[in-house]
């Protein structure tokens, strides 16, 4: 077994891989952090809203919505992980210990893996629901729980492996350029796994599309509903294109550079674009909320109700504060009924 460099600094591994470790804040670092913080905050707020909507509306207490809730939780975790990265990047990277660096990387790997795996689970559940001709899946809750547990076990496995064994601390010639403490084989496996998930999603949604098209077409042959058939088909095409298109746009660039680095491409300038492609992958956690949740009419109504309730509570508190202030100077009393609209009481 070769010599292991457990006592070396982060700078040692970055120099070994040829990745620059900045000692001061460059304009590029400031831009990346500013964009990253903005995306992270939006991801946190959006997915918190999705989780609150699913928890508060009993109509969403169905297996498919449990999976959507798990997707929101994974994306919320991704927002936290990326926020942690933004506070430990740039010149601060050099001050990290090896354990701190692996924690930073592990949070990202775990959260993004959970998000991607949940996307596949949702696709499989949608296929099962469509084949069973159900609006809401009746998949036993125990199976949904097992599916969610399986997603997180796989995510934690991929996230924790680098810190324990799948690193290059004992084999410097295997270190990657984008993640100087990780083995190139880890990056290649992660990229290929994400690509496999995408191909499986394409296969599942393609099967759903052709199944629904055949079914609606048979119905159209017996009933004069050709315009409705066309509308249903176009709507399904739109849904499939949005789902797969969002995944391709957000994930493909990052998968390509990870795979190139994992395969040891020396002539590929992966370091020039890695931060921006990682930001694009993180933006998928924001896009997921729009694609999988906000397109649901009932979900949108629940969002409006939650936001209106929050605004109403704030308005009520402000009115109550105004009332208590006014009582000191006049005997006029203001009552606030449950509907939140102030009424004047004539007691003088």
Curated annotation (Swiss-Prot):
The keyword Transferase does not apply. SUPFAM superfamilies: Family A G protein-coupled receptor-like (SSF81321). It is found in: Cell surface; Cell membrane. Keywords: Cell membrane, G-protein coupled receptor, Glycoprotein, Lipoprotein, Membrane, Palmitate, Receptor, Transducer, Transmembrane, Transmembrane helix. Glycans are attached at residues 7, 15. Residues 1-30, 88-104, 165-185, 261-276 are extracellular. InterPro entries: GPCR_Rhodpsn, GPCR_Rhodpsn_7TM, LPA_rcpt, LPA_rcpt_EDG4. A motif (PDZ-binding) lies at residues 345-348. It holds the Pfam family 7tm_1. A lipid is attached at residue 308 (S-palmitoyl cysteine). Residues 52-66, 125-143, 207-239, 295-348 are cytoplasmic. GO terms for cellular component: cell surface; plasma membrane. Its main location: other. The chain crosses the membrane at residues 31-51, 67-87, 105-124, 144-164, 186-206, 240-260, 277-294. GO terms for molecular function: lysophosphatidic acid receptor activity. Belongs to the G-protein coupled receptor 1 family. Interacts with SLC9A3R2/NHERF2, MAGI3 and PLCB3. Interacts with RALA and GRK2. Receptor for lysophosphatidic acid (LPA), a mediator of diverse cellular activities. Seems to be coupled to the G(i)/G(o), G(12)/G(13), and G(q) families of heteromeric G proteins. Plays a key role in phospholipase C-beta (PLC-beta) signaling pathway. Stimulates phospholipase C (PLC) activity in a manner that is independent of RALA activation. This is Lysophosphatidic acid receptor 2. The gene is LPAR2.
């Amino acid at each position: 077994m070769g010599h292991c460099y457990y006592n070396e600094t982060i700078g040692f591994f970055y120099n070994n891989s040829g990745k620059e470790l900045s000692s001061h804040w460059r304009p590029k670092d400031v831009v990346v952090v500013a964009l990253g913080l903005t995306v992270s905050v939006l991801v946190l707020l959006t997915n918190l809203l999705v989780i609150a909507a699913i928890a508060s509306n009993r109509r969403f207490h169905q297996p498919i919505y449990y999976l959507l809730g798990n997707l929101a939780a994974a994306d919320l975790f991704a927002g936290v992980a990326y926020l942690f990265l933004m506070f430990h990047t740039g010149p601060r990277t050099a001050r990290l210990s090896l354990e701190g660096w692996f924690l930073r990387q592990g949070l990202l790997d775990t959260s993004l893996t959970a998000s991607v795996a949940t996307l596949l689970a949702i696709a499989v559940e949608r296929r099962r629901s469509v084949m069973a001709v159900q609006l809401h899946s009746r998949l036993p809750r125990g199976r949904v729980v097992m599916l969610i547990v399986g997603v997180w076990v796989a995510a934690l496995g991929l996230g924790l492996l680098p810190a324990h064994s799948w690193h290059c601390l004992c084999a410097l010639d295997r270190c990657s350029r984008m993640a100087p403490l990780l083995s190139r084989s880890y990056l290649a496996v992660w990229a290929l796994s994400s690509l496999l998930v995408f191909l499986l999603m394409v296969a599942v949604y393609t099967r759903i599309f052709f199944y629904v098209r055949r079914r609606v077409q048979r119905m159209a042959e017996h009933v004069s509903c050709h315009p409705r058939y066309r509308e249903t088909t176009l709507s399904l095409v739109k849904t499939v294109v949005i789902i797969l298109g969002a995944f391709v746009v957000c994930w493909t660039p990052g998968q390509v550079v990870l795979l190139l680095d994992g395969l040891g491409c020396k002539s590929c300038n992966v370091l020039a674009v890695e931060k921006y492609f990682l930001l694009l992958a993180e933006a998928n956690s924001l896009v997921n909320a729009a694609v999988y949740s906000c397109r649901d009419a009932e979900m949108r109504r629940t969002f409006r109700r939650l936001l209106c309730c929050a605004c109403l509570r704030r308005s009520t508190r402000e009115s109550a504060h105004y009332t208590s202030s006014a009582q000191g100077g006049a005997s006029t009393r203001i009552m606030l009924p449950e509907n939140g609209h102030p009424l004047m009481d004539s007691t003088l």
